[in-house]
């Protein structure tokens, strides 16, 4: 059926008279590929956001007319052009046009701009996206399992973008339902303001938020150790759950690490699904940079510059985006209108404007150097790591080496096996998984020891 859609699409494009659309638009249409039909909409993939804007800007009505004529027997009358990054969103039913905002409360203009169309989805955040999909599912078992949804991760990994996009998607899909957004400090300030006015104002504040069909509460850790504020939240939480509402929470730590809360509150927070949003790696950061510049077509930036920025800031998306804004500001005010942003340009502007970007590019290590350093840190001989000896301390060192070679040098399992005297794929994969599982428990002694070693590279 997919091939049939492409054939019908190609036929429709050939029928469009040349004088109705530009040569550029026609070339874009010729290279476009049909993706899938969902809810009566045929999604068509173009190369990038710039091409998408050209088609949607001036020619969409003409194109839709000819497509509708060709697809009328298929009962398809709506057509949407998307970019490759949006395919997963289509598959998850997450690509929703942002329209009505009347059912969103306490959403800033910035929050309203967040959506899944401009979010890079990769390994570091994919589980969170899937969890949100389950929370919003019509399947009661899937939805209740994820309610409340507790997303945790370090500062700057994109938690706000994800939950705001989720709120906007839910609002557009459910125009008659109410969505509330609160950040911990903001909730505390408004509670204090209501308290000063009297008990009735506190009750009204509570009643308003408790009426939410979806409550998004960020940085829950900011109300720990504030007993009256936490108690109010506890009551709101219970009311929303009793009324069949949904709750998404974020924090920089897991529920069990929120030591300032009473146990009954921690128990409620952990009663649904917990999902970690990891820090993106360098390659994922480059994807984010590419996506960011995709929507800012007037800038040209070299791959070397992207790698330089990603290397320095791939663990903190927020800081990285801040640096991109700073760099684009310099480019906007440069007298060279044909400017290409290079690595050297970024460094020169940083020095000239006395605004350090704090990009620290770490030394590149060779595989043998990594093996030597790990051996030294763990006080064993280098050749023992490559040996077949199965003593616990040697296996431990070997596991760490496998993890670092994979995650720092991006070596294949085959390459790692060759370095370690022909070890099999399954053995290498098991070592990497074992270390990752330890690292997921960030506060364990083993994780702390591994991180001390990893941070040397």
Curated annotation (Swiss-Prot):
The record's comment about this protein's domains reads: Domain I is involved in oligomerization and binding regulators, domain II is flexibile and of varying length in different bacteria, domain III forms the AAA+ region, while domain IV binds dsDNA.
InterPro entries for the chain = Chromosome_initiator_DnaA, Chromosome_initiator_DnaA-like, Chromosome_initiator_DnaA_CS, DnaA_C, DnaA_dom, P-loop_NTPase, Trp_repressor/repl_initiator
Give the region (Domain I, interacts with DnaA modulators) as residue ranges.
Answer: 1-73
What family is this protein classified in? Belongs to the DnaA family.
Please verify whether the record's keywords include Cytoplasm: yes
Q: Where in the cell is it found?
A: Cytoplasm
Stated name of the protein: Chromosomal replication initiator protein DnaA
Report the GO molecular function annotations. ATP binding; DNA replication origin binding; lipid binding
Q: Does the keyword tRNA-binding apply?
A: no
- The UniProt record gives the binding positions of ATP as 156, 158-160
Q: Which UniProt keywords apply?
A: ATP-binding, Cytoplasm, DNA replication, DNA-binding, Lipid-binding, Nucleotide-binding
- What is the superkingdom listed in this entry's lineage? Bacteria
Species name for this entry?
A: Ureaplasma parvum serovar 3 (strain ATCC 700970)
């Amino acid at each position: 059926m997919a091939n049939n859609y492409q054939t019908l699409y190609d036929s429709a494009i050939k029928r469009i008279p040349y004088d109705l659309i530009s040569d550029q638009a026609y070339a874009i249409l010729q290279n476009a590929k049909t993706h899938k039909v969902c809810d009566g909409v045929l999604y068509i993939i173009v190369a990038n956001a710039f091409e998408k804007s050209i088609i949607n800007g001036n020619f969409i009505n003409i194109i839709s007319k000819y497509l509708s004529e060709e697809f009328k027997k298929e009962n398809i009358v709506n057509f949407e052009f998307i970019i490759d990054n949006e395919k997963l969103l289509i598959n998850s039913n997450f690509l929703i046009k942002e329209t009505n905002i009347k059912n969103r409360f306490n959403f800033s203009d910035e929050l309203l701009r967040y959506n899944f169309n401009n979010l890079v989805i990769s390994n570091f955040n994919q589980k969170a996206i899937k969890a949100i999909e389950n929370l919003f599912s019509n399947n009661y078992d899937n939805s209740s399992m994820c309610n409340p949804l507790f997303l945790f991760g370090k500062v700057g990994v994109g938690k706000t973008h994800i939950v705001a996009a989720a709120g906007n998607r839910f609002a557009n899909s459910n125009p008659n339902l109410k969505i509330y957004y609160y950040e911990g400090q903001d909730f505390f300030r408004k509670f204090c303001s209501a308290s000063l006015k009297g008990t009735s104002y506190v009750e009204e504040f509570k009643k308003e938020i408790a009426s939410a069909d979806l409550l998004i509460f960020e940085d829950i850790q900011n109300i720990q150790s504030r007993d009256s504020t936490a108690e109010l939240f506890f009551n709101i939480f219970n009311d929303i759950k009793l009324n069949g509402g949904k709750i998404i929470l974020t924090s920089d730590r897991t529920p069990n690490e929120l030591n300032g809360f009473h146990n009954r509150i921690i128990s409620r927070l952990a009663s649904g699904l917990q999902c970690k949003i990891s820090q993106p790696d360098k390659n994922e950061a480059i994807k984010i940079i590419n996506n960011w510049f995709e929507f800012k077509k007037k800038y040209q930036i070299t791959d070397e510059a992207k790698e330089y920025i990603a290397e320095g800031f791939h663990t903190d998306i927020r800081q990285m985006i801040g640096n991109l804004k700073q760099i684009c500001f310099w480019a906007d005010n440069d007298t060279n209108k044909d400017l290409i942003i290079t690595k050297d340009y970024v460094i020169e502007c940083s020095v000239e404007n006395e605004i350090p970007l704090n990009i620290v590019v770490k030394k590149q290590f060779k595989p043998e150097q990594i093996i030597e350093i790990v051996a030294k840190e763990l006080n064993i001989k280098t050749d023992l790591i490559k040996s077949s000896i199965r003593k616990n301390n040697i296996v431990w060192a070997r596991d760490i080496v496998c993890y670092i070679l994979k995650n720092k040098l991006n070596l294949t399992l085959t390459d790692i096996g060759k370095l370690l005297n022909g070890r099999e794929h399954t053995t290498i994969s098991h070592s990497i998984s074992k270390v990752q599982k330890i690292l997921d428990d960030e506060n364990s002694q083993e994780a702390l020891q591994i991180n001390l070693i990893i941070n040397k590279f």
